[in-house]
Design a protein with these regions (language model features):
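Short, solvent-exposed amphipathic alpha-helical segments in soluble enzyme
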Residues: 25-30, 87, 112, 198-202, ...
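Anionic-ligand-binding alpha/beta catalytic cores of soluble enzymes and soluble regulatory domains
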Residues: 126-205
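A C-terminal functional module that forms or caps the active site or interfaces directly
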Residues: 195-249
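Fold-independent oxyanion-binding glycine-rich loops
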Residues: 13-15, 41, 72-75, 88-89, ...
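ATP/nucleoside-binding phosphotransfer catalytic cores, i.e., glycine-rich phosphate-binding loops
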Residues: 228-292
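Alpha/propeptide regions of enzymes that mature by internal proteolysis
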Residues: 2-13, 19-73
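Generic structural signal for well-ordered, non-membrane alpha-helical segments
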Residues: 18, 22, 50-54, 131-139, ...
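Active-site histidine-anchored catalytic micro-motif
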Residues: 8, 32-38, 52, 63-66, ...
Length: 292
């Protein structure tokens, strides 16, 4: 008889909550491991968007309780892609999901993979008529059994962590006196998180920056706006666009009590070029540059 190992599963998916998928997965876990509580991180990742799921999981990983982290954004469900469980943090946690890059950034932030196993043992799975609901049939039972104290080695063959698929988080790059960045995430308030932190900004830059939004090849060309570096939304009075240090230590394009994404036409994946400006007063009007 195994002794319980964990009492928490933190759960992230693209399932949404309109259908029964989330509830069924949680019910399977509760049935097999009644002592376990399931914490919903989010189930509103855009369908099939592995990158968005990996970024959300990376934002969460430093704050989740010790235990199992179950993430499912799985457009390749039912194919030869592997279902995996990865031990991290000296055994204090297990990160579980499809081997499609979803888990890689979070695993790296947790200190890297210590052991990894493919979930293939049918003794720890549910019998199913089809292969399209791995969350219910493979991941939920595995999460419950791990919480009950079953060693990962019982769930399937060990996998060399170096063979796991990497994530696809873009890096900023310098282009002369400019910094080419990308929008990683737009939150529900319309703040647009960039893939840069304050230390990535050029040391010669002051408090004012130029934002070049989009690419010349885009249908609407490039929109140019002035932004000011700020520590709170309240500093962005008079309609100023801000570059605010967000709660994850990244810089975000923001407005005060308005959606920067809507007003500036910005979405996840958009290119934003940052250019340093002389610190002058005033708020610039929008300028659009397009290819003739």
């Amino acid at each position: 008889m195994n002794s319980p190992r964990f009492d928490t599963v933190s759960f992230l998916t693209d399932y949404g909550t309109a259908d029964e998928f989330v509830g069924v997965v949680k019910s399977v876990i509760r049935d097999l491991a009644p002592h376990v509580g399931v914490i919903d991180l989010t189930h509103e990742i855009a369908p099939f968007d592995v990158r968005a799921g990996s970024l959300a999981l990376a934002r969460c990983i430093g704050y989740v309780a010790g235990g199992v982290v179950l993430a499912v954004v799985d457009p390749g469900v039912g194919t030869s892609r592997r279902a995996i469980a990865i031990e991290v943090a000296g055994g204090a946690g297990v990160v579980m999901g499809p081997d499609n890059g979803l888990l890689a950034p979070a695993v790296a932030m947790a200190g890297g993979a210590e052991r990894a196993f493919e979930l293939t043992n049918p003794e720890y799975q549910l019998q199913a008529a089809g292969a399209t609901f791995a969350g219910r049939d493979i991941f939920a039972p595995a999460a419950a059994h791990i919480c009950n104290g079953v060693d990962l080695a019982e769930l399937g063959p060990e996998v060399d962590p170096i063979l796991l698929l990497p994530g696809t988080i873009p890096l900023p790059r310098e282009d002369g006196d400019a910094l080419v960045t990308e929008v990683l995430w737009v939150d529900r308030f319309g703040n647009c998180q960039l893939n840069v932190g304050p230390d990535d900004l050029l040391p010669t830059w002051g408090a004012s920056l130029q934002l070049q939004i989009g690419r010349p090849s885009d249908p609407n060309g490039v929109t140019v706006r002035r932004a000011v570096r700020a520590t709170s939304f309240a500093e962005l009075s008079g309609g100023a666009v801000g570059l605010v240090l967000d709660s994850y230590g990244m810089l975000a394009i923001s407005l005060d009590q308005r959606s920067a994404a809507e007003e500036l036409g910005i979405g996840a994946g958009d290119q934003i070029v940052l250019v340093g400006l002389d610190d002058v007063q005033g708020v610039a009007t929008a300028v659009t540059l397009s290819r003739r």
